[in-house]
């Protein structure tokens, strides 16, 4: 049976675009909150194959999305590199900062992927239960974005600690990037082996970089990951998500050779249509706040996205993750409108 999501990545335009949502397994769902409460900590949920598989499948059962994305986190790679990673309630991730060349010199060059066996087992469990027409997405964080957390030891408003280190100590910073590139290649290949149909590389903080730094620290490492995966799996379908890239999107697509690019809601539609969608599939890009608002505002926002990208290959998604406060009825409203569309 065909998988519409994979068909788009393979070059086939669909009249009604396939649809899924970033963070579709999340706190807006009561069934997720129930499992999350049983799991204990966030990483406990990520590393419990039974629970991680369950929350991955929940939005598929409820909404029938065209793709499931494995429930995990971009910071499992630092964990596999031997770094301390913990999630504190109300504060987000905490790591031991790698903010000097001396500390960076202690970083392992390759991840111990046995620490991520639970992720691969969760993928196998989801694969066994997914409908035949539903794709399964594996993922990793892009090296730049993961490095911002590793350098600062936490999320920061403007990623200044990583940006400063990259300017002041580029050789030391490159060591972090190199370790993340090699580890991400191995991690993504193991996800494909475990049953993933496609992969997404999340570069959440790409948009804070200058054009020169974007080319060096976002696009180039992503290209290396794509090349490394395809050297072993030439048929691998890979989506890049350089959030906030804006006018740099065409260059990113050309440099990385991804099969599709996910875009946020600030992307200029004419630029994307003419210089991006003419070459690869486009995924996105509903504003999560429009989804949270609902009503006529949501209908208009959905229609705008559909009309903007109807002429080419398109996967309907949000421009970033769904917000926890979003009513389920608004997701149903969005899906009804997308599925009725005949572009």
Curated annotation (Swiss-Prot):
This is Uroporphyrinogen decarboxylase. It is found in: Cytoplasm. Its EC number is 4.1.1.37. Substrate binds at residues 23-27, 73, 149, 204, 320. It catalyses: uroporphyrinogen III + 4 H(+) = coproporphyrinogen III + 4 CO2. Catalyzes the decarboxylation of four acetate groups of uroporphyrinogen-III to yield coproporphyrinogen-III. InterPro entries: UROD/MetE-like_sf, Uroporphyrinogen_deCO2ase_HemE, Uroporphyrinogen_deCOase. It comes from the Bacteria. One of its GO terms (cellular component) is cytosol. The keyword Cytoplasm applies. Homodimer. Belongs to the uroporphyrinogen decarboxylase family. Its main location: cytoplasm. Pfam families: URO-D. Pathway: Porphyrin-containing compound metabolism; protoporphyrin-IX biosynthesis; coproporphyrinogen-III from 5-aminolevulinate: step 4/4. Keywords: Cytoplasm, Decarboxylase, Lyase, Porphyrin biosynthesis. GO terms for molecular function: uroporphyrinogen decarboxylase activity. The record marks 73 as: Transition state stabilizer. GO terms for biological process: protoporphyrinogen IX biosynthetic process from glutamate. SUPFAM superfamilies: UROD/MetE-like.
């Amino acid at each position: 049976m065909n998988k519409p999501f994979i068909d788009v990545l393979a070059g086939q335009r669909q009249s009604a675009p396939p649809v899924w949502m970033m963070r579709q397994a999340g706190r807006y769902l009561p069934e997720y909150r129930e499992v999350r409460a049983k799991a204990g900590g966030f990483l406990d949920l990520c590393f419990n194959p039974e629970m991680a598989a369950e929350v991955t499948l929940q939005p598929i059962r409820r909404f029938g999305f065209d793709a499931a994305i494995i429930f995990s986190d971009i910071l499992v790679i630092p964990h596999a590199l031997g770094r301390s990673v913990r999630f504190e309630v109300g504060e987000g991730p905490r790591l031991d900062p790698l903010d000097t060349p001396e500390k960076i010199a202690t970083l392992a060059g390759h991840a111990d992927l046995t620490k991520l066996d639970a992720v691969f087992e969760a993928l196998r469990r989801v694969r066994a239960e997914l409908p035949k027409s539903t794709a399964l997405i594996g993922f990793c964080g892009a090296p730049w974005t993961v490095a911002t957390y590793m350098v600062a030891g936490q999320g920061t408003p403007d990623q200044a600690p990583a940006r400063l280190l990259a300017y002041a100590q580029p050789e030391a910073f490159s060591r972090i990037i190199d370790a993340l590139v090699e580890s991400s290649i191995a991690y993504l290949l193991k996800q494909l082996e475990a049953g993933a149909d496609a992969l997404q590389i999340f570069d959440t903080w790409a948009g804070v970089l200058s054009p020169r730094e974007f080319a060096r620290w976002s696009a180039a490492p992503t290209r290396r990951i794509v090349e490394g995966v395809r050297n072993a799996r030439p048929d691998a379908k890979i989506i890049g998500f350089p959030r906030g890239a804006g006018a740099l999107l065409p260059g990113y697509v050309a440099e990385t050779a991804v099969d599709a690019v996910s875009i946020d809601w600030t992307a200029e539609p004419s630029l994307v249509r003419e210089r991006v969608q003419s070459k690869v599939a486009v995924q996105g890009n509903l504003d999560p706040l429009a989804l949270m608002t609902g009503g006529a505002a949501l209908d208009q926002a959905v229609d705008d996205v559909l009309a903007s990208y109807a002429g080419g290959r398109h996967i309907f998604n949000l421009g970033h993750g769904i917000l926890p406060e979003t009513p389920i009825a608004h997701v149903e409203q969005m899906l009804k409108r997308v599925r009725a569309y005949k572009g």
